């Protein structure tokens, strides 16, 4: 993995106290124009990673962001999958979720990284 990844705390500094004003399954757009995406940031050979946003509520102020681990390196019969959700909150209420997954490719010999991207900052969500 490359050293360019930042912590979730650094991502929060870019988005907390802003509002989600538009969204689709691939991105959230905040009131200041900031775009939040889920990126397939690294991989080798046939490994892959990704995620999509769902259940987004507009115009609520972001007060927190959490990454919830849903299982790491779970054997799938040919390699391993890792799962995590990115959950965005207004107070204690969920206002957006991205379900994310990473796969380590054919036979588990490779790797992939799924990252949350805000501006030029990337934060690892999950990896396999």
PLM region descriptions:
Residues 1-128:
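Surface-exposed, interaction-prone regions used to assemble/regulate multi-protein complexes
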